Amino acid sequence: TSNGVQADSGVVDADVLHSLQLTRAFGENDPLKIIGAAKVKELVWHEDAFAIGFNFGLLTSLVKLDMSVEKASGYRNGSFMASTNGMLLLEEVNMRNNRLARNGDNGNVATLDLSWQGRLKKLDVRGTGLTRVKLATGAPVVQLCLPDTIEELFLEYLTKLSDSGLILEGINNVRGYRYTNCPGIDGFAMLERLHQARLNGSGKLERFVLEIDREDDGTLLKKYYDYGTYTQTGAVDDRHSGLRGKLTLTKYLADEELEKYAARYPELTIKQPPYTMIEFDDSVADDANVSNLDNKTGYKFGNTYKMSGHVNAILSKRHRVLAKVTRMPTSRKVEIAGQQVEVNNPDGEMTYFPLHDESSNFYADAEDMNDCTVAKLDGSEGDWMMYEPFYWSKGINDYLNNKKYACYSSYPEDEMPPIPDATVLTLDAIKETQGGWLGERKIMSGKPTLMESYTTDKAYSVCKVDVSGYRRVRFPSVPGTGLIGSVFADAEGNILKSIVVPTIGLKFEAGMYLIADVPERATALHFSILNTAEFDCVVLSHSDKIEDMEPDWVANEEHLCAVVGSSVVGSKLRACITGASTTASMTWTDFHYYSQQRGMQQIDALMHSRIANLSYAKYGRRDMQEQCGAGQHNNNRTTGGTAEHGMTDTIGYEEASSINPNVTNSLIENSVHQYAWYREKDDYGGATVTQVNNICCLGYEDIYGHKYDMMDGVDLPNDTGNSGKWRIWMPDGSTRLVKGSVSSGIWITAVAHGKYMDVIPVGSVSGSSSTNYCDIYYISTASGRVVYRGNHGAYPYGGVSMSNASYGSSNTSTYIGSRLAFRGRLVRASSAVAFKAISEVA
């Protein structure tokens, strides 16, 4: 000691502990000195009452320090080391229950600073009363034991520390929490514990920092909104909260709510969910079998359906416009329905300017309609069209579970929503695998082994795919006539599971796909295909999300489609108000020709499906005649009855009569009420209705009923092996075939749907005017059929889903019309004045 007492001396062997006896050898004013301290590797000293002046900084070779005591004595409030900067080799420190576990400020602050100990592996300071522990950035700590008095829990860059190595006496005093790059620690789970303690009234958490990359429905943003955080320099910041990194929402948030959270979490990238998902429950006949999985409304949830998210974003971009062809497209020869016709390429151009959403009689060049420029809808200022924006979509059929799904994304064209991981196999790829394809065979279900399941049939083939290790598989199939189907087999060829599409209640066509869970021990799926059916692909997935069984997204291109049917004005077909009704009694060939000469086309099959699907997604039902009304029961309605109401949709009898029980009650075929109504307000703000002859659905006038719309870009060749198949021309000029029903006159109960969400009736089951799709499908299997859509008059079978493929291209009728459309380059004029000054070229 400083007073000359030599307690012990001698030569100590390396790596061998030597005991020093210091009983009554030093006092408070007699600091202890260890001669040769720089050579000490391990020090075990179960003492908490030594002199303040002991200089641990001399122990420069110390690797392990054990100064734990069984019970804290509370003898002194000093610190066990005045300086730790020289103890750079320290790896293990055990100060459990030792109240001297402090450094700096003579121990008056309950802080232990080990920020110089870059090799520290183990630290135990339980029972020490510490409120803060500082560790070296990147220290290889594998065990960290902290007291229940800790107020600042900072877990940063401790890459070796695991959950099992972090031992906390308690968390109720933690006021500040920081977590960064500790892969073995569940930092989010710790935050949840701290938050729950505060909710329970036992915790004191005030601020935190946590880097995340996770999915959430917005609950986290609300939960941690009121907490503070720390700046990058470590300063307290109570104006913002501490979530950082990336949060992908699973529920779409309104723009104003998103802005609020973005301001509170400035270092958190909040990504709206990539899509909104709609579910159709085909096990029920209710036309309103639709559920919005985004906001949990609709049939499945037993409440009123409300559109939201990406559907709302897509619909908000749609507007009525006036448009002019400003560059003629080139064209090519195409045979449609047996006729050689000129078809425009998508290299033309139309320039447009929006009309006010509250009234199409004004341009949308000011918010207040009183300040807007008057628009002329007589054709002198362009064609009256609907601007249909770009969006992403995909459909999923889960036939075996009686479900269909529709996914919508308003992401821009240059940002495709995430593509799920999946193995996709084409028929060619399957044929290239050993035993992958066996011609002139089919699988019969219900047999015990694979070999017993094969039967010869020239119309079919059997495909085999390896399903080992996968969770789900999607594969094309056939109706189960005679128990034909598919089987899962194990490595020995034993049948583990058979799948058959029942022919009773059939809502399926050959080539449509099934989705099935892969049974345990299954190594292969053997499935029957019809040789003349379209083969989409096989999808193998590890995902539990049904939407991941369709890995491809469809880019729905922006285009224009006429708000009203076509009218002859002079020598041209126009979309305009003439004071009379729309044009009829022309052949498909002539309607196509005059539309093409304008640099445009007729409405096509993709547009037909798009309008139907968006109406389902908007209203959560499929019976648009009840939703938006059926209109006047004739085919000679005066065009333009919806102009002064802009994009506002009409309502049907059910809603109108709930406002005014005295509205016209006129049933057509004892099924549907004719006319439509606008919901308005009287002078006192009360609800009232106004009856009109035209319907408005999705902003379109008479998009169903009144007159059929002939369609471009589709026919039914009905040649060998292709009976009932719709041939659809895609915008890039390619074609695809979709098998539809061959049962004419059925009330539609199912549609092809699939990736493109085709509203093409399938199966043989018939519904009614008030169930399922509430519309009828007509078809002829004679060669070269064109397709009409929407029906005529106000017949109960003629809604937004209705189509008619019974006639050839030469048929005419007073109840068959057309509707202009345009695919190509769209240019928005800089102003209404600039638009009016533009001259059309066709």
Set out the residue ranges of the language-model regions.
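Extracellular polysaccharide-targeting segments
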Residues: 426-456, 466-467, 498-499, 507-549
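Short aromatic-cysteine micro-motif
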Residues: 375-383, 413-423, 547-703, 842
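Concave beta-strand-loop units of leucine-rich repeat
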Residues: 45-51, 66-76, 95-108, 119, ...
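GGW-centered surface loops in extracellular recognition modules
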Residues: 1, 273-387, 393-395, 600, ...
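LRR N-terminal entry segment and analogous cap-like coil->beta motifs
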Residues: 11-112
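Extracellular ligand-binding interfaces
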Residues: 2-7, 479-513
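A structural signal for leucine-rich repeat
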Residues: 56-57, 80-87, 105-107, 111-117, ...
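C-terminal, surface-exposed recognition/capping segments
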Residues: 609, 630-675, 679, 687, ...
